[in-house]
Amino acid sequence: MKFKKKFYFIVASYFRFFANFAFRRWHPRVIAITGSVGKTTMLNLVECTLGDKAHYSHDANSAYGIAFDMVNLRGVTGSKLRWFYLFLAVPIKSLFYKHKEEFYVVEIDGERPHEAEFLASWLRPEVTLWVSLGLSHACQFEQQVKDGLFSSLDKAITHEFAMLPQYTQKLVIIDGEVDLMNRALDSIKQKNLTKATVIKCSKDAVKTYKVEPNHTSFILQGTADGVSHEYEFNRPMSKDIAIQLTMLETLVNYLEVMPRYDFSNLKLAPGRNSYFDGKNGLKIIDSSYNAHLISVKSILEMYKAMHVPHKWLIIGDIVDQGSIEGQEHAKLADEIIKVKPEQVILIGRRTKKYTAPILKEAGLNIYTTLDPREALKFLEQNLTGQETLLFKGSQYLEWLIEKLLKNPEEAKYLPRREKAAIKRRQKRGLN
């Protein structure tokens, strides 16, 4: 396993070496976005605001993906033979390719130890937006805790993300309501590890929040002028997005660009609170992409705030949790209970083992299965068309949604449409 991790960075260093020629030729103002969840949504908000002034690292947030993006190449999503092409194409394109935009808005993942530092020490962003902190990809950091490098998973993951602020040149924007984030930045400043200004945002700016299956509005008090502004979205958005809107306003003030408040045409990546009309009048909210407790909790709080009858939850397992999967799925049950849903469908061995018993004890109507096909059968037999369905988690929920769409052609807007994902579903008999 250790060799595999070292090999990952050896190969990543090869691609970074060549991609750096294109990066230095371009010399953009780098705006880095990091965090456990919410990075892509933050990137989309920035994109709506800056438009064609920036290049955006869509579908690229790893050491490999960002190197490929630097020379306008896509990573490996299909045949493994593409690796041979990339080993040749990256050096060649690095000799002449150059992005032309003023800004590079780049999403940086902290999925594995040392990756954030690997990217931060290369890109050295002008601005970093650290949007969230939680136990996503916890299994990747367990060895560091076992080796005594950190006393807990929380501290190991915090340390990883904190590498970006250390290498940031001008401005670091964080969620000031997250204690571990605050402590990390206070420590970095006390040790003079960064000269960047640190601005801590909070949800205190929220004056009103209204959410429906296909619409959300916020009224936020401006951080700079104190004037209240209304933000509009044509999809359901969690209240936690207020932190990102406040961060966006802070960024806009720093860059001295025009702010934006109407996000009705905001295009989010698939599986991030997409609204669909379902068969026979069903309302479908697809939030199936991310499956970590921090994101599940946020979406369930949104669902609780939504004034609709007949709330049904379809929940898949939380993945990549390693030894803490039991406690995370027990916490998941507590969050589900707060929503008071009419019906809960749990899919996966983890939700069946850890979540279902707590929900049963609380008196909720639940249906558990390991097979998405059985879940579909239950839905088709029991839905009346008056329900609002929220999908969150793993276990091929995108396949379930596809079968319930009023307009089958809208399946192209669901997550995991790449060939490899389609093949995985087919192997499970999900055609």
Q: What positions do the PLM features span?
A:
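Acidic, Mg2+-coordinating active-site environments of NTP-dependent enzymes
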Residues: 26-28, 100-101, 120-284, 308-309, ...
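A conserved segment at the C-terminal end of the G1
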Residues: 33, 41-57
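ATP-dependent carboxylate-amine ligase
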Residues: 1-11, 15, 26, 51-52, ...
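ATP-dependent carboxylate-amine ligase catalytic core
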Residues: 21-25, 51-159
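Short, acidic/turn-prone active-site loops that include or flank metal/cofactor-
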Residues: 59-62, 132-135, 203-206, 368-375, ...
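Short catalytic-loop micro-motif centered on adjacent basic/acidic residues
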Residues: 55-56, 103-107, 172-174, 284-286, ...
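Short beta->alpha connector loops
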Residues: 109-113, 178-179, 290-291, 372-373
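Short beta-strand segments
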Residues: 32-34, 107, 130-132, 175, ...
